[in-house]
């Protein structure tokens, strides 16, 4: 059975993006993302893949869920949610969903874990994380990252209630 872990960073108001980019640079969050996802397959949408320069992230199987035809070396393209579910069933692993908002919305109902970073900033964004009913989840781990006695971000790990 595959584990499906949604991983993202959001600001204090739930914004996750602006103009198809991450609207902040927090090196601690980037390191956290790399540590969590390296060695695991990642799933993303076409726009998120394009934001990476149409190049796969190294040391991870990169899966792009899109209805469009894209030709990218080193990437598995899946054209439907049904096809992705079949792939997950046939290839058990811990998968990390890396965005964007539409992909999070589509995969949230089958997710088993959430890895959220809350950036201690308020930005003006154009993309929010889909609404999550946290009553269905329980917090299993959290820690704050501070620099010069200032809270920079909070890392959280959630698991689905069973």
Where are these regions (language model features)?
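Enzymes that bind and transform nitrogen-containing heteroaromatic metabolites
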Residues: 2-162
């Amino acid at each position: 059975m595959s584990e499906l872990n949604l991983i993202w960073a959001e600001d204090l108001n739930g914004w996750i993006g602006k103009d198809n980019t991450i609207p902040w640079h927090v090196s601690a969050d980037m390191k956290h993302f790399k540590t969590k996802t390296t060695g695991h397959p990642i799933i993303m949408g076409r726009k998120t893949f394009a934001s990476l320069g149409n190049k796969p992230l190294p040391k991870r199987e990169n899966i792009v869920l899109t209805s469009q035809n894209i030709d990218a070396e080193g990437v598995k393209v899946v054209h439907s949610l049904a096809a992705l579910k079949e792939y997950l069933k046939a290839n058990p692993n811990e998968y990390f969903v890396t965005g964007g908002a539409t992909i999070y919305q589509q995969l949230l109902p089958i997710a088993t874990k959430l890895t959220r970073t809350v950036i201690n900033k308020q930005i003006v964004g154009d993309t929010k994380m889909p609404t999550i009913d946290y009553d269905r989840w329980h917090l299993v781990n959290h820690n704050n990252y501070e620099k010069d006695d200032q809270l920079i971000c909070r890392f959280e790990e959630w698991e689905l209630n069973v």
